Amino acid sequence: MKVIHLKKPAGLENLVLAEQETREPGEGEITVRVKASSLNYHDYVVAIGGIPCEENRIPMSDGAGIIEAVGPGVAGFSTGEQVIGCFFPNWQDGGPQPHKMIGVPGDNVNGFAAEYVTMPATGFTRTPSSYTFAQSSTLACAALTAWRGLM
């Protein structure tokens, strides 16, 4: 599959198109064919090195797509369903706490600048049925930003 890697040192000139094997989902994971990804200021800050990440990180925190494969132990998701990634996939409930804020796609873990992503199923939610993939891909970071502004 095609992916974009961020090489070191970080910088827009060091975003590189590459080929990488698609990983099969393991326990509790799903594989999603990415149909759309949206660019946020957060993604720009990662790309220029303002948020440090590992060499060859796949950027982009937000994405939408179709479930292609479901790993063992996954309940509540099926192949063919449309989903979006969650900005804080480890924050399932309750108030914000530091340990829930890790795992952000595109900086703590690989993100959505790829044809396929394999991630824990808990890091996804279904898309609104009336939204296009492009519309759905904008929800995670933007909705969280709006929520933070209200809180």
Report the location of each language-model feature.
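Short N-terminal binding/cap micro-motifs at the start of the first secondary-structure element
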Residues: 10-17, 41-43
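Alpha-helix/helix-capping structural signal
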Residues: 37-39, 72, 122, 144
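Short Gly/Pro-enriched turn/cap motifs at secondary-structure boundaries
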Residues: 21-22, 55-61, 104-109, 114-115
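Conserved hydrophobic/aromatic beta-strand scaffold that supports enzyme active sites
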Residues: 17-22, 64-66, 116-118, 124
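Glycine-rich beta-strand-centered segment in the early N-terminal region that forms part
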Residues: 22-37, 47-92, 128-131
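NAD(P)H dinucleotide-binding glycine-rich loop of Rossmann-like/cofactor-binding domains
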Residues: 87-151
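Extreme N-terminal starter segment of soluble prokaryotic enzymes
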Residues: 1-2
